[in-house]
Each structure stands twice: as C-alpha cells, then as structure tokens.
C-alpha cells in the first residue's frame, strides 16, 4: 500500500492478486471509501512466458515526475505508469535483465520484486530489490541496472554459525556449488528482505537481509554488516527516520525453519541512532513475555514527524507518535497486517 500526495487530493494505492481475478493495483481518491481496481497493461509480454500473479509494491515517483508510478510484481517484474496508475507498461530493462536467470524462488514461491526505493531529488536514480535475486540500482533513468548487493558480506558470528550448520544439511552451500552472476561472491547477500533509502541522506541505504542488517553510506557501492548488538540476524521489516536524525528501526525474528517469530517471546523494536554502531531494545507498550507473533517485510514505517508504526501478524498496530521509547497499541484488531504506510497530510 502507498499514498500519492503529489496532487491536491491524495490518492491511495492498494495492490495484490487474486486466484480468480488476477493481479491488481486499486486506486482511491476519497480516502478509501471507493476504489477503482482496473489495471490495464499490468502483464508481461506474451513472448516472455511468464504471468503476473500479484503486485507486491507500489511506489509513486518524486514530485518532478508527475503522474509516474511504479509497481513491483511476482514473478519479479517492474511496471511503470505515466497516468497516475491508470494504465501500466512493463520496464523491459528490468524484466529482461540478463541476470534474471539467477533469480530463484523465494519462500513465497516465484521470485518477487518487493522493494522500489527512489532518490528524493534525482529522477535518474532508483533501486529495486528482488527476493533471492539481489538489489539493483540505475543511475541513468532505467537504461541500465547494476547489482549493488553483491558487496554485502555477512561478518556477524550468528550468521556464520547458521551458514556452517546449513552447509552440513545442504552440501551445495558448503562447496559454493550453485549458480551466481559472474563476478559475484557466492556468500554475497542475494536476499534483502527489505531495503530502505534515507530520504534525508540519500547516499545512505539500510537493509534487513536474510543474514543480517546492513548499511551503505555510498549508495550501495559498499556495505557494512551492523548486526552486532541485535539478538538475531534475521528479520523482515526495516524502517528509517524521515526527520534527519539518522535513526533506523528493525524487529529481529528467530530463525527456526519457517517459524519466524519475535525473539524469546518478547515483541521488541530495536533502534539505532549511530549508524548501527549500537542498538537499543524498545519494549515499553509491546506485548511479552510469551508473545509469539511476527512482522512482515512491509509491516513497519515512519512518518515525516518522527512517528514509528508497526503492524503484526496478530492484527495489532503499535505506534510511537514522536519516535520515543514507548509504543501504544491503536484501537482494533485486524487480520494479519501485510503492509503499513505512514503519511501525514
């Protein structure tokens, strides 16, 4: 879900897929009272041999590109609209990328383009993340796309231990006997669960990956593993402050087969204010002990005034309106929350 505030009337976007009705990008111009679900052009070319199953990410472009909206799909694909999301066209430079052959299946099935991050002032620069396929950047308006996650190498002891144990049960990993793009280290991160760009410092990127939390200060050319100090290397969401204070937030999860739950039965948001050099555990107002819910990759966001909002698989939303240490549960219980978007307008 996302909100486009570039016009006088904010436009809400919601996306997904249905086994009978297919993929869609729904639009609402009346705060969600009514929706238009038509998504003309949201399909791969026939000769590609792939069918869009669902839409995982919607991202309105920056103010200097009125009308432009991007959509990321499963199977992994990028689509662009130039009429505020009314009609769509495939971005062939991504969808036919020469390294598409290395985009493997993820836990949810086919590869997924789940993250679209835009430079706040440079329309030629944007990032995309593909599940089990890496993160890519373009700096020339989409003409070419270069992988930028291949320099993210985990150094945290927790991940190294997991890798060693996994290699025992899956020998190809022990021998590094699996296909990777040319010139890419087999131990490089190819699974950024969520990548965020600091809009107040656009050279700084943050990523919660399958194997740790990483930070880049040069637009993805180099990455530092900043997992040390967290109770787990694993997790899905990551959120970045939009106020310029440099804060980032994660929700560490246990890594036990498919049982991705909060660590040690205590729901906690962890915050760093020093570029990942240290982390603070925030539990005030959050459930536990004996709490075993989880948070999906799109389940946490920040607003322009320092608010932090996190939604859970148990249907609860917790908010810190000004980024302080305490969170308050908002009224109501929803179905499992797959996306949280925080916008003040």
Predicted regions and their residues:
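Extracellular glycan-interacting surfaces
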Residues: 1-345
